[in-house]
Amino acid sequence: MDYQAILETIHRDIQPWLGKGRVADYIPELAKASATDFGMAIVTPRGEVFRVGQAETLFSIQSISKLFACTLAFQLEGESLWQRVGREPSGNAFNSLVQLEHENGIPRNPFINAGALVVTDVLCRRFVQAETAMVQFMRRLVDNPRVDYNPRVALSELEHADRNRAMAHFMRSFGNLHMPVETVIDAYCRQCAIEMHCVDLARAVLFLANGGVVPWSGERVIETSPAKRLSALMLTCGTYDAAGDFVYRVGLPAKSGVGGGIVAVLPGEFGVCVWSPGLDVSGNSLAGLQALEWLTTLSGRSIF
């Protein structure tokens, strides 16, 4: 499969989509991004790298971090993690509080904000500095010691995290948050402020495409069965309340973030990351979604 030719076709045809959508502005540091930016990269388990556009421009991974935090928490807790967070699509916005009261403080899944806060609570109990553990985990996945979080973005998020604080206090009232709220919020904001580029993020998700094993290091991150199940969660819950439409159009397990990035995997074949900061109404990259739809259409490859 000539993935480089496919990426170049996508890069050519995506131009009219750039500049559309709305850059996330509820976090002031993210509002500085340009909706005309675009990068895309594919990495295979054999080490092949295909890229176009600004594929090595750093951006804030935001909710993409939830995938890796969940993986790290599952390493530590195993199946008991699911006693505190569900595995069902939400159908509501990623920062909604609506379902928490009806469901006794148990978030629907680990990829909405409430679920991610529970996951971060797990990490805060297990590590002295959960955000440092996350950064070290990401560095290990991509073999890049320069991966880090942006303190300006983290501070900007901390100053505008009232809704997340409300969720955290609410879940704590149900006994589903064990660490102090500010400890969890601080770690969560720093985790979301990790900066990476498309090539490294495509590389970071490859363990899911490779049965839970990092191809170049041989490190087993999680067992094969949990890797499949985590991919299933990405498929059903990874793109906010637009997961159904995403699966219909793209057909790959994916996780998006309001920084404009989307990562996806095709088991046995590749990890892919696309980045363009202009977002649709659900908080997914407008051009990124279109690019991934074209990728699976032009390659004829999806999980279906």
UniProtKB/Swiss-Prot annotation:
Keywords: Hydrolase, Plasmid. The keyword Hydrolase applies. Its EC number is 3.5.1.2. InterPro entries: Beta-lactam/transpept-like, Glutaminase. One of its GO terms (molecular function) is glutaminase activity. One of its GO terms (biological process) is glutamine catabolic process. It catalyses: L-glutamine + H2O = L-glutamate + NH4(+). Substrate binds at residues 63, 113, 157, 164, 188, 240, 258. This is Glutaminase. It comes from Ralstonia nicotianae (strain ATCC BAA-1114 / GMI1000).
